Amino acid sequence: MLLLRALFLELKTNKNCKALLLLLIPLLVGLTLIIYGIVLFSTEGVIDHGDHNHLRARFQLTLEEIIVFVVGSIILFFTLASFCVSCFMLMRSPKQKQLEVDHANKTNLKPKAIVNCDLFQLGDYCVFTFKKLSFKQRFKQDFFARSKFSFRSELYRLCLVGVLIALNLALSLIEIPGIVLPWGSSIQFRFFNTAILFIAVRLVGLLSTSLVALITPWLHLLIHPIHTPISSLFYMVNDFLVLWIFYFFFFHLFKAEVIQTTTVVDNKPFSQLVNTKKTKWTKFFSLLVISFLCGFIEGLGFYFGYFLILGNVSSLGLKIYYDGLQQRDLINSSNVLFFLMTTTAIFSIKYIFEMLFFFSVEKNVVNIANHFGLY
C-alpha cells in the first residue's frame, strides 16, 4: 500500500508522467477486443442490433473469435508490461528537490496585464488587455493546460477528466436510429458525443481532451459490446479529428474565442468576458466552416466504414446492397454522391447544434477554468 501511494504521488508531481496516460488507450483496446470476442462466442455470432443483424454471420471455423482473442491478449499483455516497466523506471529516477519546484513555479508565471491608457486617476475607466502569445506559446499552453504547477489545479483537472469521460460516455449511449436515406436504407448516429469535447478544451486542455476522445469509444464498446471494433475505431478517429479541427479553426484561424478584459472602476479591478461585434461575426463564420467540414469528414468516415464492416475493400466485386435492390450499391458514383450529400447535411446540422451549445456556455466554462486555476 505504501508503494502504491508513493507511485501515485510521483505520478502527480512529475510532469513527464502524463505520457503514461497514453497507455490507457491500448489497454482499453485490448480489454474491449477480449470482451467483444467473449460476447461473440457466447451469442454464437448472432447479435440483433436493429437493421444490422445481417452483419453478425456466424463463422463456422470461429476464425474471427480466435483473431479477436489473440490480438486483444497481445495488446493487453504489452500494455501492462510497458506500464510496469515505466513505473519501475520512474521510481528509480532521481527526485526533484522542492526548491527547484518552487523556483520553476516562480519563473513560469502568467503573462502580465498591460494598460491601454497612459494616465488614469481615481474614478477613471481604463481597460487592461492581456499580452498576446505566439502560436507556439499558445499551443503549448493549451495542449498541457497548465501555466504553473499547482497540486490543487492538478487535482481539479484529474477530477474533471473523470467527469468529462463519464458525461461523454453517457451521451455516446444516446443513439438516434432510423434516419432514412433517399434509397430506402437507414443509418443511426450519436448526436451529443462530441459536444463535451468542445467544452473540455477550455477546462482540461487539448492533451487531456484528446485522451477523452480516444478512450471513450472503447469504453462504449466495453459497456455496449454489440458494436464492432471497427465502429469504435471509426468513432475514435472521427472524434479526434473533429476536436483538432475545432481547436485550430476556432482558436487560431478565426480567433473567435471570447475576450477577457479587466477594467478599473474607482481604483478597483473588475474582470469580465466580452463578445465584441468582430468576435460575434468570427463565431458565426467559424460555426459554418467547422460544422460543414466536420460533417463531411464524418460522412466520409461512414462511407468507408460500410466497406470495412460489410465487405473487402480490395475487391470491387463485393458491393453493398440496400433493400435487395440491384444497382443501388455504393460503388455507383451517383449513389456515392447522394450518400455523401445526405450524411454531410445530417452531420452538419448535428455540429451546428453542438457549436451553438458551446457558444451558449463558453463564458461559464472560462470562468470555471479561471476560478479553479486550471489555466
Curated annotation (Swiss-Prot):
Membrane topology summary: Multi-pass membrane protein
Subcellular localization, as worded in the UniProt entry: Cell membrane
Changes seen on gene knockout: Probably essential, it was not disrupted in a global transposon mutagenesis study.
Domain of life: Bacteria
Annotated transmembrane regions: 21-41, 66-86, 160-180, 203-223, 234-254, 289-309, 338-358
GO cellular component term, pick one: plasma membrane
Disulfide bonds: none
The entry's keywords: Cell membrane, Membrane, Transmembrane, Transmembrane helix
NCBIfam families for this protein: MPN160
Protein name, as recorded: Uncharacterized protein MG147
Organism of derivation: Mycoplasma genitalium (strain ATCC 33530 / DSM 19775 / NCTC 10195 / G37) (Mycoplasmoides genitalium)
